[in-house]
């Protein structure tokens, strides 16, 4: 797992180069925006159970076959596993937001997830829909100006969206 700073230094070191002005400027911008990043992580984390439960509720309303007898989320044990997986994905998205880098999400959560779902017979497309619903909720929270450090959050929102998009792509 790398944070944005470690990743930039590691890449420059591998090439045997000094940090470029563009790299330093990008990291400086990240530092300047750090309070927004912390606010976003805090708000998503504080609302995690609501984000997950509302996303699951919406998913099951759209795809009732998942909770019907024989469905992948039928029985309380399978439903709990589904909610747990959604919560884990959301948790690793917040880690990536905090670090400013997707490697923790990729390495510790998404790597091999599609294969696991295929082996279990879990429809990856349904998981992707659920992740998309969590993305919508998380972005609504991040884009709500109340309680967020003042300023433009569009770049951070775009970054957060990209982490959810990676998760969707990894499972579908």
From Swiss-Prot:
<feature type="binding site" description="covalent">
    <location>
        <position position="82"/>
    </location>
    <ligand>
        <name>(2R,3E)-phycocyanobilin 1</name>
    </ligand>
</feature>
<dbReference type="Pfam" id="PF00502">
    <property type="entry name" value="Phycobilisome"/>
</dbReference>
<comment type="similarity">
    <text>Belongs to the phycobiliprotein family.</text>
</comment>
<comment type="function">
    <text>Light-harvesting photosynthetic bile pigment-protein from the phycobiliprotein complex (phycobilisome, PBS). Phycocyanin is the major phycobiliprotein in the PBS rod.</text>
</comment>
<dbReference type="InterPro" id="IPR012128">
    <property type="entry name" value="Phycobilisome_asu/bsu"/>
</dbReference>
<dbReference type="GO" id="GO:0030089">
    <property type="term" value="C:phycobilisome"/>
</dbReference>
<keyword id="KW-0042">Antenna complex</keyword>
<keyword id="KW-0813">Transport</keyword>
<dbReference type="InterPro" id="IPR006247">
    <property type="entry name" value="Phycocyanin_b"/>
</dbReference>
<dbReference type="GO" id="GO:0031676">
    <property type="term" value="C:plasma membrane-derived thylakoid membrane"/>
</dbReference>
<keyword id="KW-0488">Methylation</keyword>
<protein>
    <recommendedName>
        <fullName>C-phycocyanin beta subunit</fullName>
    </recommendedName>
</protein>
<dbReference type="InterPro" id="IPR038719">
    <property type="entry name" value="Phycobilisome_asu/bsu_sf"/>
</dbReference>
<comment type="subunit">
    <text>The alpha and beta subunits exhibit high affinity for one another and form heterodimers. These heterodimers form heterohexamers of 3 alpha and 3 beta subunits which, in turn, aggregate into a heterododecamer consisting of 2 heterohexamers.</text>
</comment>
<keyword id="KW-0472">Membrane</keyword>
<dbReference type="GO" id="GO:0015979">
    <property type="term" value="P:photosynthesis"/>
</dbReference>
<dbReference type="InterPro" id="IPR009050">
    <property type="entry name" value="Globin-like_sf"/>
</dbReference>
<feature type="modified residue" description="N4-methylasparagine">
    <location>
        <position position="72"/>
    </location>
</feature>
<keyword id="KW-0157">Chromophore</keyword>
<keyword id="KW-0793">Thylakoid</keyword>
<keyword id="KW-0605">Phycobilisome</keyword>
<feature type="binding site" description="covalent">
    <location>
        <position position="153"/>
    </location>
    <ligand>
        <name>(2R,3E)-phycocyanobilin 2</name>
    </ligand>
</feature>
<keyword id="KW-0602">Photosynthesis</keyword>
<keyword id="KW-0089">Bile pigment</keyword>
<keyword id="KW-0249">Electron transport</keyword>
